[in-house]
Amino acid sequence: MALKDRVLPPELKRLETALKTSGLKVDQDADVLAFAAFADPSGKGTRIVGIAQGQFQTNAILAHFAKEKTKPYLLRNNSVYPMGSNGMSVVFLNQTTMVFGDKAAVKAALDARDGLAPNFLSNSEMISDMASVDQKAVWSLLDAKGTQTMLKSVMGDAAQLADYDTVRNRMLSSRYTMDFSNGVKFDMAVVMSDTLTAATAATLMKGVSLMRKSSGSPLEKSALDETTIDSNAGTLTVDYSSSDSQFASLLTSPLFQSVVR
């Protein structure tokens, strides 16, 4: 639980708290509960939305809202209800599916569902990639632009090198998974346009690892020793595993913060 509390982003903790205090009893009725992070359509950072599926007692929930004098606002034909007092909202798409999050996140989700904004289902390549990650506890898919932004942060000063410019323009997509069933296991794959580019990216990444080892703490050096960087058939791969306690200690390190900032 301590590790979970430290790994979850503040927005997701807020969403989890709002759900628990909403009186909706989603944890009892939901068969599937998932959280998704996505880029805000307006370009203002990242939004997180929750999606739950199950046999919900919608009549009882609506009666609860009526008792609490909670009034919805209409977004097209969708009734969006405030959820608690911390700015969260919830909407029932049908008898078995609900979407919840902050007001802007719920609106963005409904706009995508109603065909008013681009949505994930229109990207056939990412839908295909999803099959390799969606069974994990935490997973992410990034398109070419998102991959470029992510790797620029990971590379740090090395992103200024000429070789990186060549690599950056040949990034197609990336994905990562995290598994907490036996310690912490992190696997990332970055798909490049060709085998040579993937090998070049792996070489650059290994160079970054060596530089950070030279200036890192013993904990950071140990983490980098446990990280395997390679390339295979046009894909850059990065794999890391550790115990829960090792990973928890790493979360506050300058190395980890420089990667996730």
Language-model segments: residues:
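A short, solvent-exposed beta-edge/loop patch
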Residues: 83-115, 183, 228-247
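One face of beta-strands
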Residues: 48-52, 98, 172-176, 182-190, ...
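Solvent-exposed, non-transmembrane alpha-helical starts
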Residues: 60-62, 109-111, 198-201
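Structural boundary/hinge residues at secondary-structure and domain interfaces
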Residues: 1-82, 128-166, 203-228, 235-237, ...
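A conserved glycine-rich beta-strand in the N-terminal activation segment of trypsin-fold
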Residues: 88-151
